[in-house]
């Protein structure tokens, strides 16, 4: 796949950022190990950043051409149990990522990580860099449904482990650390009229909540 976009931004009358970003991706089809049901997917991603800045901290005043790459292996193991009135699904999953190149400094960016975006390739919402370093994202999804009453319970947990701290990753996400927060969520539909959503993050010492919210 190929995608390209560009921008020319003027801030504070004298700060200029010009960029053209080209993204290439190659994904190999899932390989299913039928004996155990393990699904694997391997992706190779390339980013070509052409940039020029004036009075800007991230981009130099002379034209720059940068090439970045990212390798990712995703695996999950769906486990399903069915009864007459209920279904139970348990999915352990992980993502291994490696970026041999550096990234732009986004340490001060505002970004909240949760169970909905922690496995996203661009989980920081940035377009000029891939996430730097080695990381392993580990998670588990559980879902149970009552087929006759249309009620269900969904639970998700995930965390990120890396080999060393990364100074340019948004610090408020905690993913810059060797061990990130533990992210979790619950979606509980008691009936057609009552539904409870709960999201939370526990710090990497597991002794306090970084955030929690009910929806």
Kindly label every feature range from the protein language model:
Residues 1-215:
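Outer-membrane beta-barrel proteins and related beta-barrel translocases across Gram-negative bacteria
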């Amino acid at each position: 796949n190929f995608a390209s976009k560009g921008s020319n931004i003027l801030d504070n009358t004298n700060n200029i950022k010009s960029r053209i970003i080209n993204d290439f991706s190659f994904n190999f089809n899932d390989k299913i190990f039928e004996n155990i049901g393990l699904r694997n997917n391997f992706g190779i991603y390339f980013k070509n950043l052409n940039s020029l800045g004036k009075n800007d901290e991230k981009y130099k005043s002379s034209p720059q051409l940068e090439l970045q790459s990212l390798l990712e292996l995703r695996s999950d193991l769906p486990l399903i149990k069915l009864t007459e009135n209920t279904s139970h699904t348990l999915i352990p999953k992980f993502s291994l990522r490696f970026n041999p190149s550096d990234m732009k400094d986004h340490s001060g960016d505002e970004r909240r990580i949760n169970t909905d975006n922690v496995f996203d390739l661009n989980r920081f919402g940035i377009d000029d860099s891939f996430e730097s370093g080695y990381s392993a994202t580990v998670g588990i999804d559980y879902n149970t449904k009552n087929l006759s009453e249309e009620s269900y319970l969904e639970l998700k947990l995930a965390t990120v482990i890396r080999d060393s701290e990364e100074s340019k990753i948004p610090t408020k996400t905690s993913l810059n650390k060797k061990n990130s927060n533990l992210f979790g969520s619950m979606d509980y539909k008691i009936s057609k009229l009552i539904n409870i959503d709960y999201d939370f993050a526990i710090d990497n010492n597991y002794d306090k909540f970084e955030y929690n919210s009910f929806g």
